[in-house]
Amino acid sequence: LLRARIKSIQSRLERVRNQREQSRRARRRAELPVLSLVGYTNAGKSTLFNRITTSEVYAADKLFATLDPTLARVDIEHLGPVLFADTVGFISDLPTTLVESFKATLEETADASLLLHVVDVSANNRDELMADVEAVLGEIQADGLPQLVVFNKLDLLEQTPRILRNESGTPTAVYLSAVTGEGVDLLF
């Protein structure tokens, strides 16, 4: 009975992978850049996705509020059309029974043009959470993709939105609040 159930689940996962691969091929043919929101669970990815895309995907302060990647096309001044992808929140020490289904969901991320690594700036353990996300990105071969860190929930710290740049002037991080919208314009 258990073997049959496992086989059924593996078969469904394979169908999902195939469907997503077909979708990825279609997006590549359309040549639209994909900006993928990644980050630890409850970092505010869906709230930021909704703010940028004017969508209304479910956003809640709980585990697995987002279970499937959501895509939305947005026309950005100076860039043109892009696809934004909202992804499932990462968690550490994921039970082995869930690893395969999460990998199937997160494989979309490996095809992104840019990762927007959303971090809850108010979290006391944010460095640890960022490291957990980086580890998962490595597991799905997405750790070599261009990345911009988005420190979200700035409204909880009463700080000013800003951009951090490296020595050559390239943006490396943006501080903003997806809830209030402050600093979101700095992304573009």
What are these regions (language model features)?
Residues 1-114:
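Conserved G1/Walker A P-loop phosphate-binding module
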